[in-house]
């Protein structure tokens, strides 16, 4: 027994599970859509101080301008405490005419030609043709429990936490347990001699700005409906806490993407995160994300996303498996085993 599902439905299920009932109670359905995110204020894109051929040149230039970086202590380092959620960003405008979060993975948008290399532009046109035909990209890597990776991490609309220390910064996303570790004042190290979903990130502080260089990233995409990235993708980010017109905290990330196999020249965008004290008040916490043993979605022969349902031989019970189902206390939900 199989059923055709849209990726939009699958994404909604994941979002509800990730953010919890408290999030759903606080925001309306419309308020959590990409269209509403696209209406949120977003700062102007800040281009690099001059053109750079590589991320390494860009990063080292900023490091020199910062005289080696600010040496923070635990008493001086910026604190980005609390829970955060993704806001608006300008990335779709790199690849689409009048691109925004409202049309990034929906039909009707026109591709900007001459941004991608010929081979990657050809692939992007094929992806957008699928969006035009079916109203969406039929299959997304997340369906197979693959990591969103960089740069998709910057936008993923889930709960995040940021912890800054003098020697490291931890950027934690509840989706897929994706924690970015930025090693402050360090060099890139790759003892495994391979690429990674989140790459390898080093950084330095320039006052209250955190500058980050990420490389060795697995090929992925910018987000569903957007172009692919290659295994030569790198990016340079600057992170800074600001306040919007209402006085609310926000994190602003100015980023430049470098990808010689996919981009004709480096491209820049700005991303934002909103402080969400309401989530903390409602008791939302980041939990361990579990996907591989509970996901019943898969890619069908026609390229669409389908789901196994109870009764299918391949169906996996999201409550898990036990050799002793009759033994009290073996359920993953302790409510069912509570004494009456």
Region spans (language model):
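Sec/Tat signal peptide C-region and signal peptidase I cleavage site
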Residues: 20-24
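PEST-like low-complexity, intrinsically disordered acidic/proline/serine-rich tracts
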Residues: 25-340
